[in-house]
Amino acid sequence: MLKWIDTLDIAIELYEKHPEIDPQWVNFMDLRQLVIELEGFSDDPEKSNEKILESIQLNWIKEKE
């Protein structure tokens, strides 16, 4: 079960599920929705914030490199 604090695991899941997406161009609203739609995500959608989303995005960019 993924929670917002699992930023690296979320990034890996996003990379595996959406290899066609370049994460550096994903805005935070879309990123939030992509995370919420992950099969293993089970946290409160309202608990996300800019710091968490930025961490997910940076980890996703690193995974893609």
Give short role names for the model-derived ranges.
Residues 1-65:
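A charge-rich, low-complexity, intrinsically flexible signal that marks solvent-exposed coils, linkers
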